[in-house]
Regions:
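Intrinsically disordered, Ser/Thr-rich regulatory regions of eukaryotic membrane-trafficking proteins
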Residues: 1-602
Length: 602
């Protein structure tokens, strides 16, 4: 029997909004349900689990979690059950994400974190969309399948980073020129001026061109688009891509370039131009200022609701002021709106907000419980209007459909221009660069992974694990190195060395200022009262968070963060590993073909 795993999302009424689980989980749950008398014996071997059965079995633990949160402000992060089964919890916009598995705790927590990120990309703050629109829940399932598959097979995805294929300058210029011409031709044909064209090969970043007015494409959004492209091509209905006219189009909400995600509406078109070679077009649609302020309003309203439930009134005034500011930004963004449906929805929103505002102000002035109860009731209607406004201003099926034909033509332009180098870049992606030429300078070194956590770009020699013999470095050992190091990083350890019978392993994370001068933190990364989030990029930038913790008086934008993982054969002294690490970091631009510079990725 396989390992059991499942993901469930519950709303505030403990109803199931979404479920994704494997057959082992279904079999186990149905057997329990028959024992409990909530499922007839003849349904014991069904291939699905009814929602009412899940609610019956999980309501006690979900309710307990909500009580721990609301009454004590001290929710569970995980529960270990008899037999090794683990249940992990996470929360987003009042929805409870529950992950169940028999594997390592960090892996289940990471899966929950990725699930929240994917839900935000697909639905923004309105998680209920997963129940209301089956297309969304199906796409979420496909994305999670792709992530799980890539996590097990792609080192960069495991690290939530981007691997860039290194091309010589002349080749790079001709690729960018081809992408530029495709974007320029698109701008003249469709009603959109903010466009990115990204070329990806075997889930690796090859090149990007962005139109002048487009917002910078963040590493988070690039990584998401790679997983989306992988999911699209794997799940194509014909199973055998005809690259002459295949296109996959999606409406998503990207994070944007700022440190906290903003849910910016984009149409994404993925066009395969050869096997494992995709052009991804990003069309920025709608009003980004409105989308950002709408998302902020959802976030601050959710915080207000949490404060009310937890009765933590000492922080209510600043939370209310944040909500008021976010609503003002929404109103300002809609001043020039000419759409009748949006205008009608906005008027309703303003009316409800004015009533809410009076009640919150009344409560803050004289702590009147009745005023707070009334504000809470009004907030429910206000939330529904917010959802409607979000849908009206971010969904634009028209541009998604009308731009498809032009995008296919633009992709053909690129495909023709790059025809002579397609095979070369595919081979280059498989063997980006080899460690062989550096073995003399770094005796004993068999593998390293260097990650610039400003651009989230990873530099690492290519290894064909299929060719390796079991006694040499295996994929399992490299994956364990990464998981082990990140588990300790979450606990606050930024330097680590350990060994097994064959290899010595090392992990270091450090900070530099913009001049490359090392920075030493005087603030400990963790304390007994605070746990760090799961290391990663897609849900929230963990590395941004630790910059803020370690250097509270410095702007995070002035701090650069790096990590390096090293594997040496045999026993190696600590000074040798440290010296190799320093020299590797200093010469990494030679390996990657360009200096480490935050703007290089773009």
């Amino acid at each position: 029997m396989g390992t059991m795993n499942g993901l469930m999302i519950f709303d505030h009424l403990n109803d199931i909004v979404y479920i994704k689980c494997n057959n082992t989980f279904i079999k186990h749950i149905n057997e329990l349900a028959v024992e409990d008398g909530v499922l007839p014996e003849e349904n014991k071997h069904d291939t699905s689990v009814p929602d009412n059965v899940l609610v019956h079995l999980f309501s006690p633990v979900v309710t307990s979690q909500r009580i721990m949160t609301s009454q004590f402000g001290n929710s569970y992060s995980s529960i270990q059950c008899y037999g090794g089964l683990k249940i992990c919890f996470d929360e987003f916009m009042g929805y409870l994400f529950v992950g169940i598995g028999e594997g390592e705790l960090l892996k289940i927590q990471k899966y929950l974190s990725i699930s929240i990120a994917m839900v935000r990309f697909l639905c923004g703050p309105d998680v209920y969309e997963l129940k209301a629109r089956s297309q969304r829940s199906e796409l979420l399932s496909n994305l999670l399948d792709s992530y799980n598959d890539l996590r097990e097979n792609d080192q960069a995805v495991l690290l939530e980073a981007i691997e860039q294929v290194v091309l010589n300058p002349n080749l790079n210029t001709s690729v960018i020129q081809a992408l530029k011409e495709s974007v320029v031709s698109l701008i003249t044909q469709i009603d959109c001026f903010k466009i990115h064209a990204l070329l990806a090969v075997k889930n690796k970043f090859l090149s990007l061109y962005s139109s002048e007015l487009a917002k910078e494409l963040s590493p988070t959004d690039i990584l998401f688009s790679m997983i989306l492209a992988d999911s699209a091509t794997k799940n194509s209905s014909d199973g055998n891509l005809n690259t002459s006219n295949s296109i996959f189009s999606y409406q998503v909400l990207l994070s944007g370039p700022e440190s906290s995600p903003k849910c910016l509406p984009h149409a994404i078109h993925i066009v395969p131009i050869d096997e494992e070679l995709n052009i991804i077009f990003f069309l920025e649609i709608g009003n980004s200022a409105l989308s950002s302020s709408l998302y902020e309003t959802f976030c601050h309203l959710h915080i207000m609701q949490q404060i009310t439930v937890q009765r933590d009134f000492s922080v209510m005034r600043p939370a209310y002021e944040n909500l008021e500011l976010a609503v003002k930004k929404v109103n300002d963004s809609l001043k020039k709106n000419k759409n009748a449906a949006i205008d009608a929805c906005h008027k309703n929103l303003v009316k409800k907000w004015d009533s809410m505002k009076k009640k919150y102000t009344e409560f803050l002035k004289n702590s009147a419980e009745e005023a707070l109860l009334r504000a809470e009731t009004l907030a429910l209607g206000f939330l529904e209007d917010l959802k409607q406004l979000l849908h009206l201003t971010t969904v634009n099926e028209g541009i998604l459909k009308s731009s498809r034909k032009n995008v296919i033509e633009a992709a053909k332009l690129v495909s023709e221009k790059l025809n002579s180098i397609k095979d070369f870049v595919k081979v280059k992606a498989m063997k980006n660069f080899s460690l062989a030429s550096y073995l003399e300078d770094f005796p004993g070194l068999v593998h390293f992974i260097y990650v610039d956590r400003t651009t989230h770009r990873v530099t690492s020699p290519s290894i064909n694990f299929q060719m390796e013999k079991p006694h040499l470095l295996t994929k399992r050992k490299v994956w364990h190195l990464i998981d082990f190091a990140l588990q300790h990083l979450q606990e606050g350890t930024m330097s680590l060395m350990w060994k097994d019978t064959i290899f010595s392993y090392a992990y270091f994370l450090w900070f530099e200022d913009s001049n490359g001068t090392p920075l030493k933190s005087t603030v400990p990364l963790t304390n007994p009262n605070k746990t760090l989030p799961v290391p990663g990029l897609l849900n929230n930038d963990f590395y941004q968070k630790i910059k803020e913790i370690c250097f509270p008086k410095m702007s995070p934008s002035k701090i650069r963060c790096y990590e390096i993982f090293c594997v040496h054969l045999g026993l190696v002294s600590q000074p040798c590993v440290l010296e190799h690490t320093r020299r590797l970091a200093a010469t990494i631009w030679e390996l990657s073909g360009h200096p480490s510079h935050p703007m290089d990725l773009i």
